[in-house]
Structure formats: structure tokens, C-alpha cells
């Protein structure tokens, strides 16, 4: 049931409580102003008297350690104050990480690598945001690695990515995503190609751990790693692989005791495994909502948002000028493989893709690799384009791209199973 609060209402929050609201109406707009006291949104402090605007899809939890008064106006689907919040436990986790960072600083060692794990819809990316914000507020410069290919907090879904966090996230837009390191995966779940997923995670971990050494402040700040919500069977094996690859010092487990106990059993004794509750404000998303969220991120990549609109380009590329590949060949039994190769090597093989009508709506990744002889898996990507039309008569495709024509010389495009219906007016 929606709550029409167009005239505005003041909410008085006691210490250690939070105001939660959700917006699901398509054109709804909610304005929030901190009137007195101190409050924060996922670790970012609100500025007094400044109006913050939230739109459709927003799930907001404004927390206060000391008490505050907040003015809210607009149409919300849910709005309430809760005193049951795990924020005190989350700040205790930050304090423990800060202790690790101080030790690393004194000994000129790398700061802690921390994995945030748990099933879907328990607030993993929110906890990452809180811990990163708290870190930069005390002068740290941590790295943020996102291994969740199903949603994509840094890049679009289907990729793993890392960024350097130098300032707190914007209340309305999140972290600035400048100069990310992004590796192509091409699937919405690690199950799409488990061998490739582990290879991409290993490469990302290797490169980012080395990059810590380039700057003293970043070195001691460490890495916060967001993971997928697939935690059983092969998904659990992927978590263990990520913990090894990133040399995890701590693993924070959200809301699943079984996963917590499995990790206690399977990771080295020097890794701190901590069980944390999820926030009562976390909302479970249906498959449809998760799909909408993916689509929205892709749309924002091409078109921006209401505050910062982008104007992408559309241009034709002939089939003969398309250098299109995918990573992972169809599986073959070991007996059919060349001598010295295993079937799993085929999962990392770069194979040519023929342009057909099946390409329509697919996202293509533009790689910085110039040929298939390069390390395509371990090469950063330049960006994305979307196939909006396939013309078999003209032997051409229409591409939606943030950059004007032509494609860069020697452009190597990688196929992704991600699709985007470009119906932008």
C-alpha cells in the first residue's frame, strides 16, 4: 500500500534507529532533508538542510547514531522507523578492519582482503558500501572488487570489476565509477562457464593485489570483495576459490549459519570468519525484479540518468568489419582434444562468432586486446555496445555505442549472453 506524503512529514529518530522507505511507483519522486542531528545513508553522511531526491526502485535506510529529525515528502510504497538494525555490528566490523590496517601500516604490509558472502538478497553490496564509506571517512583508500556477475555494482552484469574508492559514495548515485578495471565474463551466473569464471577471478585478484603496492595509503587500506549469491555446490567452490585468490584475511557471512560453519571448516585457521545478521530492511527480489535491475544498469550505461543524461550514438558496421569472438568453445571429451590439452582448456578458448540474426539485442564487449593471440581473458575492456539491428541483406549490424563511429582500429568484440531491448524514445 503506497503512502502519499506529498505535503511532507517530519520523522524523529532516536539514537541507533533508522528510517526505511521503498519507492516502486514508476514516476514517483521522494525528497529527503536532514533538519537536525546527524544521519547517514549506508555510511555516507547526510548534509543538513540539503534536499536529496530518490526515484523508482530506491530502497533507503537512513541511520542515526545520535538521533535526528528528517523531513520526507513524496509517494512511497513503504515507510517506517525501525530500532532493530545491525548497524552497530557493522561498525564493529569496520573497527576490526581498521585495526588490521593500522598493523599493516606499521609493518608496511598489505591491508586486509575481506570477502562479503551470503545468499541472494541479504544486503552484501550494501554492507560493502557501508564498510568502504567508513574506510574513506577515516582517510583510507580501499579497493572495491565486485565478483557478482549477476547484477554488477561497478560495471554492467556479466563482468567482474574493481575500482579505487577515494571519497564516500554520493547519496543519490553511489560511488564514482571512474577508471574501473573490468574483465569480460559474458554470462549472468558463474555456472555459465565455471572454468572461465575462476580464471577471470584469479586474474583480477592477481592484478589488484599487485596494484596495492603502487600506493602506500592504498596498500594498507586493503580490498573489500563483493561476491555472488550462489553459495551451494559449485557456487560454494567459487567462494573458496575467491578466498584463496584474494588471500582473504576475513570473511563476513550474512544471514546463513550453514555457510558460516562450512567456511569455518574449509578455510585456513588464520582467516577470521564472522557471522552477521542481515538488516530487516533488506528486500527479497523476484527473478523479474533482478532482470529489471540488470536492464536498468545497462540503460544507465548508455543513457545515463535524469541528473546526468547521456546521448549515445547509433551506427552501421559491415559483417566483414566485425571482429567478433566469444570465450569458451563447445565442450569436447578429453579423447577428442589435441595432445596435452584438457576439456577445460576449451572453456577458455577464444572462438570466432558468425554474425546472424541471433545477435540481435546482445551486449558486445569492446576489449583492449588487439588480437586473439593476446591474453584476452586478462585484458581490461574499453566499454560496451548493443546490437540493435541485424540486416542479412546488407550484411551489416546497427550498434548502439557511447562513442561515435567508427569502431577503434583492430577492435576486438566479445559476445555476451546479456541482452538489452533498446526502446529509449
Curated annotation (Swiss-Prot):
- Signal peptide residues on this chain, from the entry's feature table: none
Report residues binding ATP.
18, 59, 121-126
Q: Name one GO molecular function term.
A: ATP binding
Its subcellular locations are: Nucleus
Family annotation (InterPro entries): Clp1, Clp1/Grc3, Clp1_C, Clp1_C_sf, Clp1_N, Clp1_N_sf, CLP1_P, P-loop_NTPase
Superkingdom of origin organism: Eukaryota
The function of this protein is: Required for endonucleolytic cleavage during polyadenylation-dependent pre-mRNA 3'-end formation.
Q: Which family does it belong to?
A: Belongs to the Clp1 family. Clp1 subfamily.
Identification of the protein by name: Protein CLP1 homolog
**Biological source species:** Drosophila grimshawi
